[in-house]
Swiss-Prot record:
It is found in: Cell membrane. The keyword Mitochondrion does not apply. Belongs to the UPF0391 family. The keyword Aminoacyl-tRNA synthetase does not apply. It comes from the Bacteria. Keywords: Cell membrane, Membrane, Transmembrane, Transmembrane helix. The chain crosses the membrane at residues 4-24, 33-53. This is UPF0391 membrane protein Meso_3392. It is a multi-pass membrane protein. The lineage of its organism: Bacteria, Pseudomonadati, Pseudomonadota, Alphaproteobacteria, Hyphomicrobiales. GO terms for cellular component: plasma membrane. InterPro entries: DUF1328 (IPR009760).
């Protein structure tokens, strides 16, 4: 999933440099959503490990 975040960030950067602002915005929105999902899963994993210990 981290690979997809990096790909979307690169697409957003390139699209922004080329003047395709709507594509850049869409790619950034996708990256933000994936970052939120990764953070939630990370917190759930950490809390699960703490609860087991």
């Amino acid at each position: 999933m981290l690979k997809w975040i990096l790909i979307l960030l690169i697409v957003a950067a390139v699209a922004g440099l080329l003047g395709m602002h709507s594509l850049a915005g869409a790619a950034m929105t996708g990256a933000k959503i994936l970052i939120a999902i990764v953070l939630i899963l990370f917190l759930l994993a950490v809390l699960g490990i703490i609860a087991i210990a």
